[in-house]
Amino acid sequence: MSEQQNHSDTFVIFTLAGTTYGVHSNLVQQMEMIEHITPVPNAPPAIEGVVFSRGRVIPAVNLRVRFGFERIPLDIQTRMVVTNLDGRTIGLIVDNAREFISIPEDVIQPPNEAISGLSGKYIEGIATPGDRIILILNLTEVINLTDIPVIEQQSEKEVRSENAAR
């Protein structure tokens, strides 16, 4: 008799404009409150700027703006989900993030044809654990890494300039 094991993955769960999203926890380094964002001139609209986190300057991407939602002021609930994607550390600004959950593979469905266009490529799957619906993001598609090197170079110059002025 063969026993079938139900494999599950762990996800960081966050909300954005009233919708629940998940990212694979192995891509997340930490979740933190946002104290200060330094704007970077000529950055793409979704790049809020850079933040200093654990001794590093990292780009901060506003997922509301990236997904075409209304930009809202940051508040006490706003979090930054710090990710490591292809060797680059990037902060994702979300409305709220406080939860790690394990989701069985059998409750994650591939996105169907109803989810199409640009937003469709951002969605890796749709999870339905219990009575919840969680959109699982494909971070490689969500974060356009071609924008990030410019931001990293600009932020390094700004940090050097600030240090030289001291």
Task: Please report, for each region that a protein language model flagged, where it lies by residue.
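An acidic, low-aromatic, low-complexity terminal/linker signal
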Residues: 1-166
